[in-house]
């Protein structure tokens, strides 16, 4: 697509989405069409390329896409909380400037073209989770521990970026995201947070606006890590010129669950006298590496695993600290002994204050939709293949190599290519299409 034409269409789409998102209720298709038509007319005078366009065709395509998104539904998450939880946000939010949250919301609507229901669910859920945390500006000290549970690949990262944005607006000043145990996952999470929260990418000593930063850089957080590197002694030296006590903007760390990385963060925060700054610690995949694997019921005061102890020490550095774990498999987390409280490490990471479950959207395609559940099994989406036994026997050695592809697999590949082509023609190229072929346990 011509760059000018693409810009013209994006202006129409973004402006229409902004208006429709701010209207109350679910719009009728006729109202959606009128809105898109009005913005087409408004921008046509600015873009000469419009003279070469078919207005009806462009408006129809945009309206079809937007209305298809309106069919996606998502319920509000469900919360379990302790008796000491006291809602605080309703009373405080009139004094909060939602700069980071509004910027992130605008990014989801305009740039990511998220369905209205998906954006509204992140809006509501992130607000509810923040309300379960403590008011960072309240007098005195607090420590809160919570857990957010969601299905695999259902939007956990997008949700905690929304929570981080809201928390930064509310007054949390130190934000740490522990993103897995491998560099690949940490780098991916860093990139997502740059797009959705910081708005810039530091690479090769240059600062490039990305994501939310392309729309507004009136304010920006202090990025303590980059896509190139985890927190290190070199990065700590570079941050000497600015301390958390010298700015009202939040500091963001995206680190691996690695004892060396965590120790360097702990030492830098301890040296920077940050103990009075409110801390939000996000533990992504909270059931991985964070659990104290050395725990024994008969020895509750035993030495914890290295990473578990460091996470607890990190929380203990601050007078105001909130730990929020995110996971799709919470079994280990809810089985943590809630009574553990050692002199050296403090309480363990049991989510003693709240658990919040994120609901799946109606278009989420997961294991339950494929297989059903125990009471209502389903094979609606399964196709049983019976032409592959001669090509790839069920029992085979790891060295086995098939001599040809089954006709069913060839048909499936052709179908995937055709379906992807149709989707591209209808909606453009901003969609991922994936096909996984896994016919042997040795090739997973």
Q: Can you annotate each of these PLM segments?
A:
Residues 20-141, 183, 187-248, 254-276, ...:
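Low-complexity, highly charged intrinsically disordered N-terminal segments
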Residues 141-148, 173-174, 249-251, 431-435:
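Pre-Walker A (Motif I) flank of P-loop NTPase domains
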Residues 142-160:
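Walker A/P-loop
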Residues 151-152, 180, 440:
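P-loop (Walker A) phosphate-binding loop of NTP-binding proteins
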Residues 157-171, 192:
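Walker A/P-loop NTP-binding motif
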Residues 157-161, 186-187, 262-264, 290-291, ...:
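Short helix/loop capping segments that flank catalytic or ligand/cofactor-binding pockets
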Residues 167-185:
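Conserved SF1/SF2 helicase motif Ia
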Residues 204-211, 277-283, 287, 293-426, ...:
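Conserved P-loop NTPase catalytic core
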């Amino acid at each position: 697509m011509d760059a000018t034409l693409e810009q013209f269409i994006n202006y129409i789409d973004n402006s229409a989405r902004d208006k429709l998102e701010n209207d109350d209720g679910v719009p009728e298709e006729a109202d959606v069409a009128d809105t898109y038509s009005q913005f087409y007319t408004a921008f046509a005078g600015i873009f000469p390329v419009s003279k070469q366009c078919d207005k009806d065709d462009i408006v129809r395509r945009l309206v079809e896409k937007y209305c298809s998104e309106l069919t996606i539904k998502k319920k509000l998450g469900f919360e379990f909380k302790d008796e000491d939880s006291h809602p605080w946000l309703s009373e405080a939010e009139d004094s909060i400037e939602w700069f980071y949250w509004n910027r992130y919301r605008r990014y989801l609507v305009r740039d990511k073209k998220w369905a209205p229901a998906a954006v509204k669910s992140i809006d509501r859920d992130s607000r509810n989770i923040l309300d379960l945390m403590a008011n960072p500006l309240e007098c005195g000290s607090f420590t809160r521990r919570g857990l957010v549970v969601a299905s695999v690949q259902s939007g956990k990262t997008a949700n905690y970026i929304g929570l981080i944005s809201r928390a930064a607006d509310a007054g949390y000043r130190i934000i740490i995201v522990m993103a897995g145990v491998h560099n690949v996952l940490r780098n991916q999470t860093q990139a997502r947070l740059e797009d959705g929260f910081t708005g810039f990418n530091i690479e090769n000593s240059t600062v490039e606006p990305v994501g939310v930063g392309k729309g507004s850089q009136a304010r920006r957080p202090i990025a303590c890590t980059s896509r190139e590197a985890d927190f290190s002694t070199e990065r700590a030296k570079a941050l000497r010129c600015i301390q958390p006590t010298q700015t009202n903007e939040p500091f963001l760390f995206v680190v691996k669950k690695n004892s060396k990385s965590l120790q360097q963060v702990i030492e830098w925060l301890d040296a920077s006298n940050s103990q009075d700054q409110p801390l939000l610690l996000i533990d992504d995949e909270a059931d991985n590496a964070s659990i104290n694997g050395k725990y024994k019921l008969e020895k509750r005061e035993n030495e914890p695993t290295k990473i578990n102890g460091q996470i607890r020490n990190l929380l203990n550095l601050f007078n105001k600290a909130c730990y929020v774990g995110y996971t799709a498999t919470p079994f280990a987390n809810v089985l943590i002994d809630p009574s553990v409280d050692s002199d050296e490490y403090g309480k363990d990471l049991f989510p003693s204050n709240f658990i919040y479950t994120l609901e799946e959207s109606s278009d989420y395609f997961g294991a339950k939709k494929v297989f059903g559940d125990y009471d209502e099994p389903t094979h609606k989406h399964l196709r049983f293949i019976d032409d592959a036994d001669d090509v790839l026997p069920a029992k085979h050695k790891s060295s086995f190599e098939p001599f040809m592809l089954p006709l069913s697999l060839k048909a499936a590949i052709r179908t995937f290519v055709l379906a992807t082509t149709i989707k591209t023609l209808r909606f453009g190229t901003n969609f991922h299409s994936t096909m996984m072929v896994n016919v042997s346990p040795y090739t997973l």
